[in-house]
Amino acid sequence: LDCPKCMVEIDGISLIDRQISVLHAESLYDIVMIGGYKAQMLKKFGTKLKINPDYSKTNMLWTLFCAEEELEGDVIVSYGDIVYSREILQELLKSTADISVVIDKGWKSYWQARSEDPLDDAETLKLRADGVIMEIGQLPKTLEEIEGQYIGLMKFSAKGVRQIKQIFRDAVKTSELLGKPLENSYMTDLLQATINKGFLVTSVPICGEWIEVDEVSDMDLQLTHDRLNSIQRSLDS
């Protein structure tokens, strides 16, 4: 790959350009990118840019906290290799919870289109009746353990930001999170540690209308093109 993953183009438009268009449609302009591989290429987007110099040996959570000083007040955190519809973003913005996590209730058809085995690459997600998340990001043994799929999009209130900073700083002291090396931790590890601490992590359920590019095959998938066209149409209307 000769560019950061978020700059990969599908139908002539990069993932990050598509994501920025959706954010701008909801008047969200204060955007911070956190780059690793070939991060200097991200300067052209004109947003604030933070760089994880250790990107090759660290994971998502470490990368997020390379921008720790930017985590203040209400914050939306999004992976760079996804695109979501304006409607999904609107649902997230409506949530009044301190920690709100978008989950796809219709995940199974998307996973089946992308892989022979829908348990491949899927993670556990267990909900309380009121939509509060009890478990996230573990390896599922059965489909029953997956009540939705995390898409990599979430929102934190000022209080929620303080909660995750506390979890991260505590983890820095031991260099571990959930028994794993902190630098290799995933975002879902942070969310699970937050749940374990007794803080509420609330789901924002959606159905479809988002895409993720994990593999080259995702770019060739007809469903990817169909969803991106639909997302673009709703932006243009």
What feature does the model see in each segment?
Residues 7, 125-127, 203:
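A structural signal for short hydrophobic beta-strand segments in well-ordered beta-sheet cores
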Residues 55-59, 108-109, 210-212:
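A short acidic, often aromatic-flanked loop/helix-cap motif at beta-alpha or helix-coil junctions
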Residues 9, 13-77, 181:
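Conserved N-terminal catalytic core of the sugar/cofactor nucleotidyltransferase
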